[in-house]
Amino acid sequence: MAKGVREKIKLVSSAGTGHFYTTTKNKRTKPEKLELKKFDPVVRQHVVYKEAKIK
């Protein structure tokens, strides 16, 4: 069976709350780091989430 192209990543809040989302990303089509604006329930605001590796 072939190995999938999509890799698991973690989106970490830039607000410094420690909150994160997990998602998958195709490394071949999107080699750059992902930055998305998502809701942080700790500060109850939309903040920028940046890509980090899952350890």
Curated annotation (Swiss-Prot):
This is Large ribosomal subunit protein bL33. The gene is rpmG. InterPro entries: Ribosomal_bL33, Ribosomal_bL33_CS, Ribosomal_bL33_sf, Ribosomal_zn-bd. Belongs to the bacterial ribosomal protein bL33 family. It comes from Pectobacterium carotovorum subsp. carotovorum (strain PC1). One of its GO terms (biological process) is translation. It holds the Pfam family Ribosomal_L33. Keywords: Ribonucleoprotein, Ribosomal protein. The keyword Oxidoreductase does not apply. One of its GO terms (molecular function) is structural constituent of ribosome. GO terms for cellular component: cytosolic large ribosomal subunit.
